[in-house]
């Protein structure tokens, strides 16, 4: 029997299809982030100015709903993915959570919603975009030279990618394979002294899964 080379499955490129359905005023998103999540206008405006926060209408079958979009953007400015947060509670559509929480199809699994303060020299990782925004709200007066990154879950690959990119001016993920990016953090730990105690902070929930992840 001849050995066959099995090619890795290539993921379809991400396409941001919500652009025509965005709401420039961000009114419903702003109300949700203020009333339900306790964020201030100042913080919301800061993230809106960053260009990666938006409000849009999502259609699923005959159901239309307003959503907040958290865009993952590469250093080249291209959108690599996005996560969606429902604004209006609907226990019929979402019996478990009450609101939509979803990563858009074909999003880059090693990317996440991020925000830079100054010129990043360290990284702070979060489970969700709104956790990231809440952290910024609490710490914004003292934050400097840091990149905040949402993993949309607990993903070592995201930590690996953003750490390697921080140490290479963003070049690592552009020049290396998916597998190499996944292994970058372990490789850096084994072969260099670049991973210092103050380089990476993991700011996640104090639950069993998160503690196991850390």
Model regions and ranges:
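Basic, glycine-enriched DNA-binding surface that flanks or lies within the catalytic cores of DNA
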Residues: 6-117, 141
